[in-house]
Amino acid sequence: MPDNTAQRIRYGRLISVAFGLLCIGLGLNGLIGGVNLGSLHIPPRWDPAVVTFPVALRAECWFFIAYACLLFFPWRRIENRKVWNGLFALLCVASVLFAFTMICEVMAKNYIAQNAHLKAKIPVFQAVLLFLGLGQIPIELFSRKPELLD
């Protein structure tokens, strides 16, 4: 394997870990209802006064944390092929479910804005998260089987 391919795979893995940390941060922030650090206030992603499904929001937060834990698995060190295939299938399903969650979030925020007679914000953050979530599938596949890149 060429050195630049190995380096790109390492960068992809670092992106996966950073994305996992972001998912844990988003999940914890949603579970505790925002963070106040002196003058810095990080609100939850959903306004509790507007959203009336707290169980669904908690489930989404726990899903983010579980998805992040799945990203932290040592994918290259899993020796058993059946275990790796099963976990990879789980990662594929979880990544697609994560993308579906982001699409549903955009639709819900548009619906809330429409009911308030406002214009919805452009969903840049959700789009970035969607593509990062779907990008985990090839990152882990090629970190396990780099010969497929050639």
Question: What positions do the PLM features span?
Answer:
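Core segments of alpha-helical transmembrane spans in multipass integral membrane proteins
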Residues: V51-W75, V93-V96
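Membrane-water interface at the C-terminal end of transmembrane alpha helices
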Residues: A127-L149
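Hydrophobic alpha-helical membrane segments
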Residues: G86-E105, Q126-L132
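Cytosolic juxtamembrane helix and N-cap/initiation of the first transmembrane helix
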Residues: M1-G25
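Non-cytosolic membrane-interface motifs at loop->transmembrane helix junctions
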Residues: I112-F125
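Juxtamembrane "helix-exit" motif on the non-cytosolic side of transmembrane helices
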Residues: V35-S39, I103-I112
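Juxtamembrane helix-break-helix junctions at the cytosolic face
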Residues: T5, C69-V93
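Hydrophobic transmembrane helix segments
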Residues: L21-W62
